[in-house]
Amino acid sequence: LARAAGRPVVVLAAMLQHSPLMLITLERPDIQTPGDLANKRPMLEPGSNELLPYLHRYTRSRQGETLPYERGVQALPRGQADVISAYSTTEPFTLQQQGIPYRVFSPRDIGYDFYGDNLFTSENEVFNQQERVQRFLQASLKGWRYAMDHPEEMINLILEHYPSGAGREALAFEARETRALMQPDIIEPGYMQQDRWQQIARTYQEAGMIKAVPNLTPFLYNSTQASLRQQRQLLDRSVAI
């Protein structure tokens, strides 16, 4: 969306092959299918724009027609919303622990398959700070690989040094679900395809969120192209001198 708006952002890597974002509602007789979400009260958290094409397809709701996000998944049993944005890695476990029956609706069910936990930077950073970008990217990938290979160690680390209120069982659930979305056993962490980004852009276009699919070649990080561009810039400066 930012690239389509003309902002010079660059995506470095897609850490999750599938986004954890989905819609969740309480199990109730009047909400059985996505079409039943029409005329219901959706509550979306900031940064969940990827759910709008799915929601718009069935309800014609747009971003300005959703409720302000507050209280998280507890908004459902309190009757503050009929359906909310949620992460498959966390909210289902919370409702399970509370013994509350729920139903989920995922954009993936109709082919809206977004990447998750993407790393972004700016064109300026890519072309002027190549070494820093590379170090950051490689460190991030290394960290993710280690976390996937040592989930118990990461859980202990979080509980001891970065307590978030989530207990061991909740963190273990999150680790399992994250691994399923990342698929590190069959896909290299960070891997992404231009064709898939193209399809994501078309999904936004069909929902009326962007006017046209932008040129995505400069949007996807390519260390070789960045190096060549920097070399050309240095050569141009040398010629000018």
Enumerate the language-model features and the residues they cover.
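Secondary-structure end/capping motifs
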Residues: 127-209
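Conserved C-terminal helix/tail region of periplasmic/extracytoplasmic solute-binding proteins
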Residues: 198-241
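Short, glycine-/small- and polar/acidic-enriched structural segments
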Residues: 1-69, 73-78, 82-86, 105
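Generic structural signal for helix capping and beta-alpha/helix-loop junctions
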Residues: 19-21, 52, 93, 112, ...
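Class I S-adenosyl-L-methionine
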Residues: 3, 52-56, 96, 159, ...
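Structural motif detector for alpha-helix initiation sites
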Residues: 33-34, 123, 216
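Helix N-cap/coil-helix junction residues
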Residues: 7, 60-61, 100, 164, ...
